[in-house]
């Protein structure tokens, strides 16, 4: 009887009410049915894509030990590849970061597309990739202008693009925004806005933080290599400690994570960070920022190392002196900063992985993709790296970076002659009042 009354009420409703009710029903179905449809959608699931050679060699092992060896062998292969791209230099590293960014974006967007593909959303994938292009143009254009100012000012096309960079970026984004509005379909309004938000959050997580990775790299390769290596070390050591000694679950989002692995990974990462920092601080190619040399028409990483990368003597606290018998220790100041980096990599960095685990559980998938056997997708390997990159960038800006004289000089040389003369007279007057200029002339 209740159903009959509801049908009568619906039939007696005015046309406008019926239309709004049907819209609400469609929207409600979109919101409520998304989870149920996601269960049947062809999501990227984890499959056994282990190379046939490894499958044969490890066929007699249990699944636990087979996974151990597969992960171990491919981890060593990835580390070897990491060494190769480091050897090739910062510009190749920048290209690799961009490729990783594109692949991570593809993996996340593909999950959304596979979940909602049955709705046949117009222009979803096209607009997602278009917005990726727009955001990359904005961020990398800013980076090139900031770090390679001399090169940009020398080339006429680059100078024009640099001058109007933000306007061009805004125009590109506005075009995509208008395309999205024009693609709206009445029965999919709510879901289309869901996916619009999905794309923009993905851009925020992937592209913005990839941009920060590039910034860290240009400050000196050591600011790129040490943080990434600390995250890799923590991932490996936490897995090893958890594999052999793990008994106590750490977090429900990742049932395989244990307190033993978490704590063991922390101490191992701090020691590793100190040792790696000591080795790298002695090489100019690692500690010098990437700069464009106008004379040689090339990018260089040669400079006079700052105090951060010069050995200094530190007094050891009395309590520790009695234990080890040393009163002082010689180390690089950067090693002290490496403790902060390795601590973040091992204590806070894993929460990037936990966040990714929650995301995957929400969509009932094991991995983002099957790109790397035993490891999942590229995003599965970089979920902690992006959080680490943001921390390093903030750390450099807050505690390390100061005014850059070379950048100031480059900007000074682009001014008009009258502006240069005004700055010269102001600076001369300031130095004379301070007694610096007079003292310098007397010394000569």
Swiss-Prot record:
Reactions catalysed: a 1,2-diacyl-sn-glycero-3-phosphate + CTP + H(+) = a CDP-1,2-diacyl-sn-glycerol + diphosphate; 1-octadecanoyl-2-(5Z,8Z,11Z,14Z-eicosatetraenoyl)-sn-glycero-3-phosphate + CTP + H(+) = 1-octadecanoyl-2-(5Z,8Z,11Z,14Z-eicosatetraenoyl)-sn-glycero-3-cytidine-5'-diphosphate + diphosphate; 1-octadecanoyl-2-(9Z,12Z-octadecadienoyl)-sn-glycero-3-phosphate + CTP + H(+) = 1-octadecanoyl-2-(9Z,12Z-octadecadienoyl)-sn-glycero-3-cytidine-5'-diphosphate + diphosphate; 1-hexadecanoyl-2-(5Z,8Z,11Z,14Z-eicosatetraenoyl)-sn-glycero-3-phosphate + CTP + H(+) = 1-hexadecanoyl-2-(5Z,8Z,11Z,14Z-eicosatetraenoyl)-sn-glycero-3-cytidine-5'-diphosphate + diphosphate
Gene Ontology CC terms, in alphabetical order: endoplasmic reticulum; endoplasmic reticulum membrane; membrane
Tissue and organ distribution: Ubiquitous. Expressed in the ganglion cell layer and inner nuclear layer of the retina.
Membrane topology type: Multi-pass membrane protein
Pfam families in UniProt: CTP_transf_1
One Gene Ontology term of the molecular function aspect: phosphatidate cytidylyltransferase activity
Residues annotated with Phosphoserine modification: 20, 32, 34, 36
GO BP terms: CDP-diacylglycerol biosynthetic process; glycosylation; lipid droplet formation; phototransduction
Residues with Phosphothreonine modification: 30, 50
Enzyme Commission number(s) of this protein: 2.7.7.41
Pathway recorded for this protein: Phospholipid metabolism; CDP-diacylglycerol biosynthesis; CDP-diacylglycerol from sn-glycerol 3-phosphate: step 3/3
KW Membrane (keyword) present: yes
Spans traversing the lipid bilayer: 78-98, 129-149, 165-185, 212-232, 261-281, 339-359
Keyword Nucleotide-binding: no
Keywords: Endoplasmic reticulum, Lipid biosynthesis, Lipid metabolism, Membrane, Nucleotidyltransferase, Phospholipid biosynthesis, Phospholipid metabolism, Phosphoprotein, Transferase, Transmembrane, Transmembrane helix
Cellular compartments annotated: Endoplasmic reticulum membrane
Biased composition (Basic and acidic residues): 1-38
Region (Disordered): 1-48
Subunit structure comment from the entry: Homodimer.
Record family assignment: Belongs to the CDS family.
Function: Catalyzes the conversion of phosphatidic acid (PA) to CDP-diacylglycerol (CDP-DAG), an essential intermediate in the synthesis of phosphatidylglycerol, cardiolipin and phosphatidylinositol. Exhibits specificity for the nature of the acyl chains at the sn-1 and sn-2 positions in the substrate, PA and the preferred acyl chain composition is 1-stearoyl-2-arachidonoyl-sn-phosphatidic acid. Plays an important role in regulating the growth and maturation of lipid droplets which are storage organelles at the center of lipid and energy homeostasis.
Protein name (record): Phosphatidate cytidylyltransferase 2
Top-level taxonomy: Eukaryota, Metazoa, Chordata, Craniata, Vertebrata
């Amino acid at each position: 009887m209740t159903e009959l009354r509801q049908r009568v009420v619906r039939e007696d409703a005015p046309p406008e009410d019926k239309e709004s009710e049907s819209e609400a029903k469609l929207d409600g179905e979109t919101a409520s049915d998304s989870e149920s449809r996601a269960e049947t959608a062809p999501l990227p699931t984890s499959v056994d894509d282990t190379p046939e050679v490894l499958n044969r060699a490890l066929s007699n092992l249990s699944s636990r030990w087979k996974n151990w060896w597969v992960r171990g062998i491919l981890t060593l292969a990835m580390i070897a590849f990491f060494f190769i791209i480091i050897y090739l230099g910062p510009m190749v590293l920048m290209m690799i970061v961009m490729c990783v960014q594109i692949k991570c974006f593809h993996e996340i967007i593909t999950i959304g597309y596979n979940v909602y593909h049955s709705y046949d959303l117009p222009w979803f994938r096209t607009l997602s990739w278009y917005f990726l292009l727009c955001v990359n143009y904005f961020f990398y254009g800013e980076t090139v202008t900031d770090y390679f100012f001399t090169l940009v000012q020398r080339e006429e096309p680059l100078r024009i693009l640099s001058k109007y960079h933000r306007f061009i970026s805004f125009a590109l984004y506005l075009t995509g925004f208008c395309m999205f509005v024009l693609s709206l379909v009445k029965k999919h309004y709510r879901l289309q806005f869901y996916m619009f938000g999905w794309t923009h959050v993905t851009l925020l997580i992937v592209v913005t933080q990839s941009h920060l990775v590039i910034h860290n790299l240009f400050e000196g390769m050591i600011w790129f290599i040490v943080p990434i290596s600390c995250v890799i070390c923590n991932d490996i050591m936490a897995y090893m400690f958890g594999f052999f000694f793990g008994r106590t679950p750490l977090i429900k989002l990742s049932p395989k994570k244990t307190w033993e692995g978490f704590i063991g990974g922390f101490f191992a990462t701090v020691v590793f960070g100190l040792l790696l920092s000591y080795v790298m601080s002695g090489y100019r190619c690692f500690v010098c920022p990437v700069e464009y040399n106008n004379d040689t028409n090339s990018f260089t990483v040669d400079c006079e190392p700052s105090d951060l990368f010069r050995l200094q003597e530190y007094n050891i606290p009395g309590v520790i002196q009695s234990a080890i018998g040393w009163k002082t220790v010689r180390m690089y100041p950067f090693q002290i900063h490496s403790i902060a980096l390795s601590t973040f990599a091992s204590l806070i960095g894993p929460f990037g992985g936990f966040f990714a685990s929650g995301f995957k559980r929400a969509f009932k998938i094991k991995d983002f993709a099957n790109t790397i056997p035993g490891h999942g997708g590229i995003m599965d390997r970089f979920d902690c790296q992006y959080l680490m990159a943001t921390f390093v960038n903030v750390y450099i800006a807050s505690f390390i970076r100061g005014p850059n004289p070379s950048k100031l000089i480059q900007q000074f040389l682009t001014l008009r002659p009258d502006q240069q003369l005004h700055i010269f007279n102001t600076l001369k007057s300031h130095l004379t009042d301070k007694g610096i200029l007079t003292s310098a002339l007397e010394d000569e």
